[in-house]
């Protein structure tokens, strides 16, 4: 009887309808039928059964299996790649307030319009102490809008955090901060980095999205001040069909944009046919450069296992845009006491549909991208039908999302 073995670091992952061969060493993914997966197992484990010669020859010619002196003792599992690896949380968002002076139509944080809550200085210190004790080295202070907090309190928060973390970033909207306040931060919390958002380089369009006249002028003035003061800063925007972006201005640093998550006020009303075609995960767009790196990063950098988000009410969430999951409330407690290990280990295995998909170890999960109120629903933009092993038509999906006339755009 001939014996075979897998040719290097190769894993077979089974799905509901089809299977996938992860050829890590040769940087390839092969979509195969279950008969092929069965043939691989039977061949390398030395099972006494008739092997399909055509499939066997294809496996040999593609270097999936090679002849061997003896059969393998067991099929390796792709999770073997993760042995010895650790998931260490190093970053946390701290929502110092959910109050905001803007009314951005896409904002993931809708609570600011319903329930006003800002952290007290003592609450903030407790949060910082617990994060530092847990080993968090990087934080970002966010809102709402941090500058709705009294200056004395906010500056005390910045000073306290500055002395306890390796990296600290303040994310604000740029409409309430003065040049003098920026100068104070540059002098008194020198390692602070600044982040703010600008979604259009056309005044009327930016103000339309924020729903506050004059916001564009104030934001761009802040960007100019940051550039003149030589502070470390970045600015970002979102892709939305609701406004025109215009010609990019030079504010001294690269400008980056991201797709709107369907959280808070974010909804499909911000997407048109063009944006949906960019966003949908299709057979053509499901690609990777380095399969090993992709698989390891998806496991090690799963958002729920990398971040904490502490709300202004001291509730601890796994993600800044995902509040359907919670570790618990930090008020009067230690962070180590409330951390939910099941959230830290959250993966595609927990997601409906994805748990039955053979590509689940090569596909990043983002919980805010579920379309309904079901927090375990698969991402709305994935076109792979794992139950039937086929990729859905993108035009048909766009019609479902935007209406029957959408593709005609």
Could you say what each language-model-derived stretch is?
Residues 7, 322-409:
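Flexible mid-to-C-terminal extensions adjoining Fe-S/redox cofactors in radical SAM and related proteins
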Residues 10-12, 192-330, 377:
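Radical SAM enzyme [4Fe-4S]-AdoMet core and its adjacent flexible, acidic
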Residues 35, 152, 322-324:
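Residue-level structural signal for beta-strand termini and adjacent loop
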Residues 93, 97, 101, 300, ...:
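Residues immediately within or flanking Cys/His clusters that coordinate Zn2+
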């Amino acid at each position: 009887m001939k014996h075979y073995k897998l040719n290097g670091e190769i894993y077979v992952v089974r799905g509901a309808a089809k299977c996938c061969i992860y050829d890590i060493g040769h940087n390839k993914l092969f979509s195969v039928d279950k008969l092929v997966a069965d043939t691989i197992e039977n061949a390398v484990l030395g099972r006494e059964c008739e092997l399909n010669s055509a499939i066997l020859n294809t496996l040999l010619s593609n270097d999936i299996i090679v002849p061997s002196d003896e059969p393998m003792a067991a099929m390796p599992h792709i999770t073997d790649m993760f042995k010895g690896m650790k998931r260490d949380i190093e970053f946390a968002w701290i929502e110092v307030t959910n109050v905001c002076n803007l009314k951005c139509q896409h904002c993931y944080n809708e609570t600011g319009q319903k329930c006003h809550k800002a952290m007290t200085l003592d609450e903030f210190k407790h949060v910082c102490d617990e994060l530092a004790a847990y080993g968090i080295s990087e934080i970002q202070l966010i809102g709402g809008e941090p500058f709705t907090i009294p200056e004395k309190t906010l500056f005390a928060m910045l000073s306290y955090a500055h002395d306890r973390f390796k990296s600290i970033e303040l994310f604000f909207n740029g409409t309430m901060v003065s040049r003098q306040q920026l100068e104070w931060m540059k002098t008194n919390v020198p390692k602070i980095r600044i982040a703010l958002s600008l979604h259009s380089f056309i005044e009327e369009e930016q103000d339309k999205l924020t729903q506050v006249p004059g916001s564009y002028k104030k934001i761009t003035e802040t960007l100019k001040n940051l550039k003149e003061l030589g502070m470390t800063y970045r600015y970002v925007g979102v892709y939305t069909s609701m406004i025109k972006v215009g010609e990019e201005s030079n504010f001294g640093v690269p400008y980056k944009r991201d797709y709107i998550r369907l959280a808070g006020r974010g909804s499909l009303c911000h997407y048109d046919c063009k944006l949906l075609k960019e966003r949908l995960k299709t057979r053509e767009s499901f690609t990777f450069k380095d399969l090993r790196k992709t698989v390891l990063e998806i496991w090690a950098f799963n958002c729920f296992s990398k971040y904490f988000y502490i709300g202004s009410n001291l509730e601890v969430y796994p993600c800044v845009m995902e509040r359907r999951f919670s570790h618990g409330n930090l008020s009067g407690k230690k962070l180590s006491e409330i951390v939910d290990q099941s959230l830290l280990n959250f993966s595609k295995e927990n997601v409906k549909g994805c748990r039955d998909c053979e590509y689940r170890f090569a596909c990043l999960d983002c919980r805010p991208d579920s379309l309904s109120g079901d927090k375990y629903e698969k991402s709305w933009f994935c076109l792979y039908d794992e139950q039937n092993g086929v990729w859905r038509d993108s035009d048909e999906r766009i019609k479902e999302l935007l209406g029957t006339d959408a593709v005609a755009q």
